[in-house]
Amino acid sequence: MQLAIAGGVATAIAVIIIVALVIRRKMGGRSVPPGLQPGQPLPAFTALDESGRELQSSDLRGRPTVILFVRGSWCPFCSKQVADLTKHYQDINKLGARLILITPKPLQTTRRVAKLFAVEFEFWLDESLAIARQLGLVLPNGVPADYRNEYGRDTYWPASIVVDGDGIIRHTWLSKFIVDRPDPAKLFEAVRSL
């Protein structure tokens, strides 16, 4: 009897997994926006750093750069991605590359997060989501209801871009279903391949 129940549960789990994979494949997730395709120049945009100083995307020329567009510290998947990247930060830095996180979080929150991770990530702020709109990375109603008073309704669709020293996009990863992020080792390999 117990064997039959265990077999039935295993079959049910297998069916659920197969159905989920089929649905995921059919949905296909989101595709990379036209302005972020590899081989194109990184579009011009303006952001603020954690000190409130205005920065331009053209400031990135001269060194390879990994840019992460993150939803916010309230997102467990973004927090895990940033925590995982701390393990590869030194390797990426040794290759002469920069690592920049662009976030819509308020400046005070960005400063707290910058101190929390205790690495030299650069945090760029896009609180109005102007960059997200320009690049096609807005996730409408992507902020959970519990956080909307502080962060608003919309946020970034998670993405990672590797740009070479000439400002050309070489690799773009767009999270397909909010929960997936590129393995930090893949970002490191992308920088190393430049």
Task: Provide a role label for each language-model segment.
Residues 1-44:
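N-terminal targeting signals for export/organelle localization
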Residues 42-43, 64, 157-159:
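Short loop/turn microsegments at loop-to-beta-strand junctions
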Residues 57-85:
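Short active-site neighborhood of thiol/selenol oxidoreductases, capturing the structured segment around
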Residues 58, 135, 171-173:
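Short hydrophobic alpha-helix segments
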Residues 66-67, 99, 160:
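Hydrophobic beta-strand anchors of alpha/beta hydrolase catalytic cores
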Residues 80-132:
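Structural microenvironment flanking redox-active thiols in thiol-disulfide oxidoreductases
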Residues 149-194:
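Thiol-/selenol-based redox modules, centered on thioredoxin-like
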